[in-house]
A protein has these predicted regions:
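Terminal, regulation- and interaction-focused segments at domain boundaries
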Residues: 22-36
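Short beta-strand micro-motifs enriched in acidic
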Residues: 65-69
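An amphipathic, aromatic/His-enriched active-site/gating alpha helix that lines ligand/cofactor pockets
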Residues: 53-60, 80-123
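C-terminal motif of bacterial Sec signal peptides marking the signal peptidase cleavage site
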Residues: 14-15
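Residues lining hydrophobic/aromatic ligand-binding pockets adjacent to catalytic sites
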Residues: 18-19
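Short beta-strand-to-loop capping motifs
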Residues: 29-31, 78-81
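Positively charged n-region of N-terminal signal peptides that target proteins for export
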Residues: 1-4
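Short amphipathic alpha-helical segments
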Residues: 35-60
Length: 133
């Protein structure tokens, strides 16, 4: 019995030791003023299949914030990624028909910043300069 307990405890501790912190991402894009109400309306009632796909792709604590700066609207997305292969999960999401349908609705609302647009992307990356756990 003691040996079984030790084996179980060792397995449990090993599982805890390999658990990694989520990788945090913050992305930014512009929001077209004439489409802001539509964008907010879409996100007030997102497609359930899209939310499921986000979770299947190991994304948690996902939020999008809106901010006006110098008369222009911007969106800031925060998410935590808990998977092992971000690129593969993003390809999986991009291949999902319901997500594609969703993006056909949301993409026209967004105004990519020049650096993101040059890469054919909607959202641009940001650099973390401080983190307090």
């Amino acid at each position: 019995m003691r040996t079984l307990f030790c084996l179980l405890l060792t397995a449990l501790l090993a599982g805890c030791a390999t658990r990694q912190e989520p990788k945090r991402y913050v992305w930014v894009t512009g929001l077209r003023p004439e489409k802001a109400a539509r964008y907010e309306e879409l996100h007030a009632n997102p497609l359930p299949a899209v939310n499921r796909m986000i979770k299947e792709c190991h994304i948690q604590n996902f939020s999008i914030r809106e901010r006006e700066i110098d008369g222009k609207l911007y969106l800031f997305a925060y998410l935590e990624y808990t998977g092992k292969d971000f690129d593969a999960d993003m390809k999986k999401m991009a291949a999902d028909p319901e997500t594609q349908r969703w993006w056909k609705e949301t993409d026209p609302c967004q105004a990519p910043l020049p650096d993101a647009a040059a890469k054919g992307k909607i959202w641009g990356d940001t650099k973390e300069v401080y983190y307090l756990k």
